[in-house]
Every structure is written in structure tokens, then in C-alpha cells.
Amino acid sequence: TTGDTYHRAINRLPGHCAGISWPIWMGILAYVPGTMGLGGIFGGAGQSLSFLGSLAGVEIDGVLCTGIIAIICSIILSTGSYKWLESAMLPLVVGFTLATLTCVVAMQFTEFAVSPSEIISGLKPDWTLFVAFAALALSAYGYTGTSSGDISAYTYWCIEKGYPTYIGGDRDDAGWEQRAKGWIKVLHNDVWLALIIVTCATIPYYILGAGVLNQMGIVPEGNDETISALSNIFTQTLGQWAVWIFSIGAFIILFSTVLSGAGAGGRPIPDYLIEMKLIERSNLALRKRIIRWYLGVLPLIAFLIYLFVPNFVILIM
């Protein structure tokens, strides 16, 4: 309602170190593992592209594919004009999600069918499994858009869209409070709706993994085997022809995640510098240049990380 950025508001919290609020310092510390995770997503996108190429009879090294994707993302993000790409990818991502839901339904008519009792038993807490796989499960769920970085990026997106201007800056206006409450209600509904959609879109992957991969005894290991092993959730439920749907959908989802993740991650960078008194908030031109240069370099850094640690599962964890 104030138009303030996320980090400017966070920096007002009590508990400062060297003049900066401790959540800001925590965010800076989290930058390294966050960038490593982005390198893992780049690696996954590269491996999915390599797998797609192999289906077409074109063998391309996964690392090379990752490098190509990093360069393409760097060019797209540095221009700042990728709305057309987001618009094109949205229906494809929705289509792949619907295909995954179809796989869950189709699975019930195969040897991999799961009973309601099995689903209920799977919802019961198992602390042994939690300790063993908590990091992987939480990190995987976090990359669906529920991490603190995504939450902060959402606020920047709202400001860039100009939504706070609908409320107005004059708090003495008789209708200001009513507009502010209405806007906050819209945000609440938006967040709840997003949470429901993300959860409903994520659960089918867990069900397919437990129902198909677990019963087949498949444990994906290594970059080359992981994408191929995961394709079984489609081929074993819909048929071998569905490997094309899986490979194309997996690439689109990972590529769109790379674009949105890197694009969102660039917005807070000038804000960090402002709160650390390194640049002036009023210098809008400099802030835009920083974002553009950062978004041009970030994909290349993520690729270098993957080059040194060529295992996207480990990086995402």
C-alpha cells in the first residue's frame, strides 16, 4: 500500500548489524545456495533438451545443451523483452500439467494403480524418511515458487505492474482505507489461489513417482539417467508414444522456470545496494542498468557452476 519495495520494508525491522537489518544479511548469505540451485535447474533443462534430441536421433551432450540454454537466456533476459515468450509458454506449461493429471488417472487402470489406503498411509508422518529426504523434498517444493525469494519477487512484480497506484498515495483521502483493504484482500485471494494451484499441480508428480518409479524399483542416478527414468511416469501410464509429451513438457517447464527464476532474482539486486547505501534510490536509470547487466551475466554464472558440479539433483538440493 506504500509502494515501498520488499527489502526497504524489511530493513525497517529491529535488529541491525552494521546499519542493516539481519534479514537483509540472511538474504545475502542465501544468495550462494540460491545461485547454485539455479545452476541445477539450468542443468536439468540442458539434460531434458539433450534427451529430446536423442528421441529425434540427434545426440547432443547435456553440458553443451546447458551452455546453449544459458546463452539464450542471457540474451533474452538482458533485452528485458520476454513477455511474448512467457505468453507462449503459459499454455504449454498448463497443457503439460493437465497431461500429468491425465497420467495419474490413467495409472489407476494399470498394474501401478494405488488404493486410497496407500495414499492415506503415505500422508502419515515418517520421521525416518523425513530426516533422509527432507532437504530434497523441501528444496524441490521450494522451486515451484514457494520460497522466500519467490515471495519477495512477487512484491516487486506487483510494484512493476503499478498495482499500488490503484490505491493512491493520499492517505487523507476518504476512500483510501477502503481501497487499501480491498487491494490487500485481492492479494490474499491471489496467494491462496496460487498455493492451491501449485499444490494440486505438484502432488501428481509425487503420486506418479511413488506409484510407478517406486514399484519398478527405479532410482534415478546421474544426469543422463534421471530424465530418462522420469519419463516412465508417462510411458508406463499412457504408452510409449507419451515420451514425446514428457520430453517436450519437461524442457518447457524447466526452461520457463529458468527464465522466471533468473528474471525475478534480478529485481532485488539494486534494492540490496540501496539499503547498503552503495547507490541512490532516485537513480532509476542506474537501477535499470544494474538489473539488465545482472540478468545478462547470471545465466552464464549458473552455467559455470553446473560445469564444475555437473549434477543438477545435488545442486538443487
PLM features: residue spans?
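Select transmembrane alpha-helical segments in multipass membrane proteins
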Residues: 16-33, 65-68, 129-141, 200, ...
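Extracellular/periplasmic helix-exit of transmembrane alpha-helices
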Residues: 1, 158-159, 165, 196-228
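Loop-to-transmembrane helix boundary motifs in multi-pass membrane proteins
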Residues: 58-68, 241, 273-307
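Flexible loop linkers connecting adjacent transmembrane helices
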Residues: 1-19, 49-53, 216-237, 268-273
